[in-house]
Amino acid sequence: MTRRQGGFTLIEVLVALVLMAAGLALAFAMLRSSTAVAARGEDMAQASERMRAVHGYLRARLTSAQPIVFATDRGTLRQARFIGTPQRMRFVTDLPDYLGHGGPYLHDVVADGEGRLLVGFSVAQPEASLDDLEQRAAAQRPERLVDGLRAVRFHYRGLDADNRLGPWQDRWETSEMLPLQVKVEVEAVRGGRWPDLVVTLTRSEGGAGGGLLPGGSNPVLP
C-alpha cells in the first residue's frame, strides 16, 4: 500500500488543523469586528436621534415663546418675560398637546449639574414675586429631556445701539423683553459636542418675524 493509499500523514493532519484553527480565529475576529462596528453605528444613530429630538423640542418651544409676564420684582416692579442664565432659562410658551391641554405655560429649562437637561411646567402668574417663582420651582418634579451630558450652556443676544445683532451674552439682563436669539451648546459624555442650536424668537420685541422695534425702525440683521 502506497502513502497516498494509506491516508494523510500526521504532519499533514497537523497542518490542516492549524490552518482550520487560523481560519476559525480569523472568522471570529471578523465577526467581533463587524459586531463592534454595528454596535458603534447603532450608538451613533441613537445619539443622533436623541440630539435631533432635544433640538427639535427646544427649537419649537423657543420659536413660539410669548412675551407674557410670569413674575414681578416687588422691589423694582420690573416684570419678567424671559429670564436667562448660563444653565437656566425661563419663558412662557405653549405646552405641547401631548403633555396636556396646550396653552401658554411657564417653561423652566435647566441643566441640573448632574448631566441632565430638565424642563418644568407651571401656570404663568404675573403677580408672583421672584421668590414665589423659586419656591414653585423647588416644589416641582421636572421632566427629563436628556441625560448623559458633560456640559450645557445657554447664550442670548438682542439688538445693539446700532440696531444690529449684538454679541452673545451668558445672561439675559433685560428680563422685560424676549431676546432676539438663543444659542444652546451641549457636549455629551458619549458622542462629543453637538452642533450648536441657534433659535430666533419670532415674537421677540427685537423685531424678528417682520415686526418693528418701538418707534417703527426695522432691525438690521447681518
Give residue spans per PLM region.
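A cross-taxa feature marking solvent-exposed loop/turn segments within ectodomains of secreted
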Residues: 102, 192-194
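Beta-strand-rich extracellular modules
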Residues: 187-189
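Extracytoplasmic beta-strand-rich oligomerization domains located immediately C-terminal to a leader/signal peptide
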Residues: 30, 35-128
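Solvent-exposed loop and beta-edge segments used for protein-protein assembly and interaction
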Residues: 83-85, 176-178, 191
